[in-house]
């Protein structure tokens, strides 16, 4: 049962990009809907828990949530530029590299020689995996430009995601205490990011995108439980498996085309990212 709970984040976060893409809408509508869903879920959690708030917890968690919106909105943009099956392994790999480097240099993780060797070997595998998943066999001017835009967009996205993780870690804030102020920060940032949009912010797609927002929040809550049930290393490693669902789902359910060579390299790349993520989880233990 513990492993089932620990797999919920991977399932929720793996399916979420597929649901967002099926619902549709512009990235600004998607981020507003997703953050509204996360806020609704956070309010429900708040009612049944007893979080402890200080000014530091509220402000830092709010800023952390704003960084998440930066990361998530740019991930949505990348879906339109390079597709879900390329975006998710690239995004996961970049996040693993970013958070791991912060962990080593800011929080002095991997404190032994063996853990340093294991951790940096994992980063090498992840970087190789990133290159493999971004491979394009038949490049034309349009697809090449989209890939360049997608990589830049995902670099910005990764800054957001890494900031989201690092800020609460820096101030040693419990995930339970952070949930509501983080969600408020997500909503405020999502609304601010959409101010200059020419499209309507509130459409049918906006409200439907509350569903993936609840899915993301469910995965986040399950991760808090799984860290206690199976340990941070195992919980973290299992949560990375969602990239398999989203990558394969992008190809099978969203109809994203791959040549045989691209498909083989994507599969190898995803496997390397998962192995690297698992090794990082072990190095964290």
Swiss-Prot record:
Keyword match Magnesium: no
Report one GO cellular component: plasma membrane
Where would you find the membrane-spanning parts of this chain? 5-24, 31-48, 53-71, 84-106, 116-135, 151-173, 178-195, 207-226, 232-254, 263-282
Q: Where in the cell is it found?
A: Cell membrane
InterPro entries according to UniProt: Sugar_transport
What keywords tag this UniProt record? Cell membrane, Membrane, Sugar transport, Transmembrane, Transmembrane helix, Transport
Q: What is its main location?
A: membrane
Stated name of the protein: Putative sugar uptake protein lin0212
Q: Which organism is it from?
A: Listeria innocua serovar 6a (strain ATCC BAA-680 / CLIP 11262)
